Each structure stands twice: as structure tokens, then as C-alpha cells.
């Protein structure tokens, strides 16, 4: 006959085993919330371009985002990212005013005015991923539908969680003439609505080969299509070493453009680019990125546009247990954007020098000196930009 103590012991062990098994099992759906908050200040001597750049100083919320990522099933992932961006101006502004009746015996009526338009609240990523291969295999095949970034430009596809240069393009307070601004305006970078196929192959635990093909409306973020054509993009990347990753992309952007005074719904402009990266943003040591982009703009003339940017940062970790800083990171960027290679005197060069202070791995304060110069006799712009960013 078993002793009561032994029975109790066996029962307890069984309960612990069942609890461990339950904890090891993944339940669906499961959703994780993350977010980011980024505050900016700038001061630039941009008075010569005030009609375009706005005031010479500004305090604003660059990004305030709550992100939801969920596994609906073992092979289905959903991701939604709304965003408030206070640095955006209202557009399509309309103002309507109403007046109360004039009081009996005379007096002043009450006038109420309301201004509406598109503000900084917008939907960024919103997509569903379906994996057609088993988890854990070296090769994985995915279908994505929804709104995502077009597969173009390595720095555009780098997360804004930790941008060593604060901005990908010229940013608020400067003229939008950096390479990222030019290719976004031409319809190649940033978000669009569509579908894409992606294949990932693990060379080893640290190296990945990726190929992506996508078809999109061509109109940009949250917009319906306007013609019977689609935009198409392709991008491939390969980690040639655990630290070095190279990539190339091609894009055909469609739209409706006036040609000889007649709307052309079959208009297409093209672009391509090559890029390379060493390390990752925020990792200890050196991080460097370079890319070259070339294409045609979305005008009847199809002017040749071109851009180059290179950046480097060195993340130095502080080892002292009493230090309130996690790391210090100096960074430098040069960006050259040309909106028409056939025209002399329209190229813009942006130089950015940054000193970053990591309060933790997820909180940074950066201060940058930026100088934007132009070919010809156009006055340059220079000044200071700061950013306080937190990811959670």
C-alpha cells in the first residue's frame, strides 16, 4: 500500500508537469502591444525659404504610435500601426462659420468657425502575413496583403525606432530635397496598399537571404487606385557575412500624369537602387550604410532623378555600473539629391553630424548639426535639430 506522503508527492509532480506543458503551448490568437514616442525641436536659419519650410524653430511630436502585432494562428500574423505625427501640416483645409441670430434689440451675434482637413493622424502599416511553410524550416514563403512600405531603399525600410541621423530625408525646417524626399515624391518609397510575396532562406543562424515581389495601387498611403494599372516592385538582400548585408531593388510606379495636356492613365516611371550595410542600428560598435538610387520622376518629361547617401555611427557602451548613460554614439551622414540630372545647379547636399546619448537600449537623446547647401547662388540652411525618443 502506497503511503499518503508518496501519493501527495506523485500528485504534486503530475500537476507541475501539466503546468509546464500548458505554459509551453502557444494559444491563439495572441496579441502584443508596443509603441514609440518621439519628440523633436529644431532651429534653422531658413528665412529665405520660409514659404516652404515654415518657421525657423519648432517643437513637435514627430511620432506617437501604438503598434499591435498578433498571431491569429500558427501561420497567420496581423500587424496594425496607427500614427500621430504632429510635424505634418493640415491639407485640404476647409473652414466653415455659423452665426447665431442677432439678439432682439440689437447686439453682437455669436460666430463659430470650424476648420477641418487632414491632420497628423494617419494609418501606417496594416497588413496580414500568411506563411505557407512550416515554422523552423530553412526556407520560408510568405504572402502579405494590406498596407506596407514599398520594397525600395534600404534606409527608407530601416525602422524609425532608432534612426542615427534622426531623419531619413531632410526633415521639418529644411527643404525636401534630400534623396529620400525626391524618390518618395516620385512614388517609389514610403507606404502603399497592395500585396507581396516574400521568400526567406536561412544561410545559417546569423545570415539570411530574402527576395520580395510586390504589386501596389501606386497612389500611396491609404488611397484607392485611380486607373487599371498597378505598380510593381522587387527587392533582394543577402547577408554575405554576419555583419555585412547587401541589397538591390527595382520599381515601376504607375499613375495618371498629364502628357501634352491630356491625362495619361497608363503613365509609368521607373527606378532602381543598390545598397549595403555593416552592423545594425543600436548595436555595439560600428554601424554604416550606403545606398545609390536612380530613376525618373512622375512628370511628362520623365526627368532623371538621382540620390546617394552614406552614414556611419559608432556605439560606445559605458561599462560603469554607476553611469546613468547606457551608451554614447557619434554619427555622421552625407546625402546628395539631384531632382534632374540634365539641369545644372539644382543639386542639394545635406550634411548631418549627430551625437547620441542612450539613456537605455530603448531611450535615446540626440542633438544634430545640419547644413543643407545648393548648387549655384542659392543661400544655404544650417542649424540644430534634437530628438528625444522612447520605444516600449
Regions found by a protein language model. Give the residues of each.
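Outer-membrane beta-barrel "beta-signal"
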Residues: 380-392
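A short, acidic, flexible beta-alpha connecting loop/helix-capping segment that sits on the rim
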Residues: 256, 369-375
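C-terminal closing repeat unit and adjoining cap/tail of repeat-based domains
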Residues: 352-368
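Surface-exposed beta-loop-beta
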Residues: 203-204, 208-305
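Outer membrane beta-barrel
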Residues: 26-46, 53-221, 226-230, 237-246, ...
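Cleavable N-terminal export/targeting peptides
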Residues: 1-26, 169
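Extended hydrophobic-aromatic, low-complexity segments
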Residues: 285-288, 299-302, 320-329, 341-344, ...
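Hydrophobic, well-ordered secondary-structure elements that form the walls
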Residues: 312, 332, 355, 367, ...
Amino acid at each position: 500500500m502506497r503511503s499518503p506522503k508518496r501519493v501527495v508527492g506523485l500528485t504534486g509532480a503530475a500537476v507541475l508537469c501539466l503546468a509546464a506543458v500548458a505554459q509551453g503551448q502557444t494559444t491563439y490568437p495572441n496579441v502584443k502591444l508596443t509603441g514609440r514616442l518621439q519628440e523633436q525641436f529644431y532651429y534653422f536659419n531658413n528665412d529665405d525659404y520660409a514659404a516652404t519650410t515654415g518657421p525657423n524653430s519648432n517643437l513637435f511630436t514627430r511620432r506617437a504610435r501604438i503598434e499591435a502585432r498578433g498571431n491569429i494562428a500558427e501561420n497567420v500574423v496581423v500587424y496594425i500601426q496607427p500614427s500621430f505625427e504632429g510635424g505634418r501640416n493640415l491639407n485640404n483645409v476647409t473652414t466653415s462659420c455659423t452665426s447665431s441670430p442677432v439678439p432682439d434689440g440689437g447686439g453682437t451675434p455669436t460666430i463659430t468657425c470650424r476648420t477641418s482637413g487632414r491632420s497628423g493622424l494617419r494609418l501606417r502599416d496594416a497588413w496580414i502575413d500568411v506563411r505557407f511553410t512550416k515554422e523552423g524550416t530553412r526556407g520560408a514563403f510568405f504572402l502579405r496583403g494590406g498596407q506596407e512600405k514599398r520594397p525600395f531603399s534600404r534606409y527608407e525600410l530601416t525602422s524609425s525606432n532608432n534612426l542615427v541621423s534622426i531623419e531619413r530625408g531632410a526633415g521639418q525646417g529644411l527643404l525636401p530635397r534630400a534623396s529620400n524626399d525626391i524618390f518618395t515624391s516620385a512614388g517609389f518609397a514610403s507606404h502603399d496598399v497592395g500585396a507581396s510575396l516574400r521568400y526567406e532562406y536561412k544561410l545559417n543562424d546569423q545570415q539570411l537571404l530574402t527576395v520580395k515581389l510586390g504589386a501596389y495601387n501606386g497612389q500611396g498611403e491609404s488611397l484607392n487606385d485611380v486607373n487599371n494599372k498597378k505598380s510593381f516592385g522587387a527587392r533582394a538582400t543577402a547577408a554575405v557575412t554576419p555583419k555585412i548585408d547587401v541589397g538591390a531593388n527595382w520599381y515601376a510606379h504607375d499613375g495618371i500624369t498629364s502628357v501634352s495636356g491630356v491625362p495619361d492613365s497608363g503613365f509609368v516611371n521607373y527606378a532602381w537602387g543598390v545598397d549595403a550595410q555593416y552592423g545594425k542600428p543600436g548595436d555595439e560598435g560600428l554601424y554604416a550604410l550606403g545606398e545609390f538610387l536612380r530613376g525618373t520622376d512622375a512628370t511628362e518629361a520623365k526627368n532623371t532623378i538621382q540620390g546617394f547617401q552614406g552614414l556611419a555611427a559608432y556605439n560606445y557602451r559605458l561599462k560603469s555600473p554607476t553611469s546613468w548613460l547606457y551608451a554614447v554614439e557619434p554619427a555622421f551622414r552625407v546625402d546628395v539629391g539631384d531632382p534632374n540630372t540634365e539641369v545644372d545647379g539644382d543639386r542639394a547636399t545635406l550634411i548631418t553630424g549627430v551625437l547620441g546619448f542612450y539613456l537605455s537600449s530603448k531611450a535615446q537623446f540626440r542633438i544634430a548639426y545640419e547644413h543643407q547647401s545648393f548648387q549655384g547662388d542659392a543661400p544655404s540652411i544650417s542649424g540644430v535639430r534634437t530628438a528625444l525618443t522612447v520605444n516600449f
